[in-house]
Amino acid sequence: MLARHSPSTFHMASCRMALLLGLLLLVVASPAIADDDSGIYYQLALMWPGAYCEQTSAGCCKPTTGVSPARDFYITGFTVLNATTDAAVTGCSNKVPYDPNLNQYWSNIRCPSNNGQSSWKNAWKKAGACSGLSEKDYFETALSFRSRINPLVRLKAKGIEPDFGLYGLKAITKVFKSGINATPVIQCSKGPFDKYMLFQLYFCAAGNGTFIDCPAPQQYTCSKEILFHPFKKWMLKQQLNQDDDPFQLPGVAMDN
């Protein structure tokens, strides 16, 4: 004879199944995190290439990878920090391989033209090996964080564009505070007309992948309004053979 179950029993079983499915979806949707995430947090550094090209005397060059970098903020660092001391956790190993599939959003446009692999190797040796993540997960987590932040799209949606305009620091901060519930650290550099311009953004995430305000933010000098410098073709310095195609970013025709 089949056992009878009360409606409350079926209700409890349904709730338990819904909870398990919810947790499974959360795990699948989240970036990889370290096995022991209680004592660390992450810091992601994103550079605006227009400011870099403007301020460096060497100019910018087309990478030798054959893959054009995106017309967007580039990752320049992904650091693991001790949650107690706020010190970077570095130098754990230098023998672990790295993933070279980073050409668009962790691109190196420094001159002379290069394939970017030295910067990826340095990032892995300095910080990745200490992250508690595999080499593959370390780079994929950095790219996942960058994608979740989606800085240029968020800024443009609020009318903040790389058009030589001056934009308030508070307005830039508000874009990300309202979007990801975390305040970025803004690094400025000197640009045209002796104006400060947006150079890098730093974002922090807890060990579980949740964005947070950076616990020990670096202090940088900026003005109340900063310039958002364009990223134009004329800013790029070619150090390749003259027969090579001019620098182009995927899907976007750069203005002259």
Which role does the model predict for each range below?
Residues R4-L19:
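Bacterial N-terminal signal peptides that target proteins for export
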Residues C15-I33:
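Cleavable N-terminal signal peptides of Sec/SRP-targeted secreted and luminal proteins
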Residues L26-V27, S57-G59, T183-S189:
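Short alpha-helical segments and helix-capping/turn motifs at coil-helix boundaries
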Residues V27-Y42, K190-M197:
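Short, surface-exposed loop and linker segments with low hydrophobicity and enrichment for Pro/Ser/Thr
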Residues V28-P31, N82, A127, G179:
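Generic recognition of well-structured, leucine-rich alpha-helical segments
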Residues A34-G116:
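Betabetaalpha-Me/HNH-type nuclease active-site subdomain
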Residues L102-N256:
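C-terminal, well-folded lobe of enzymatic/effector domains
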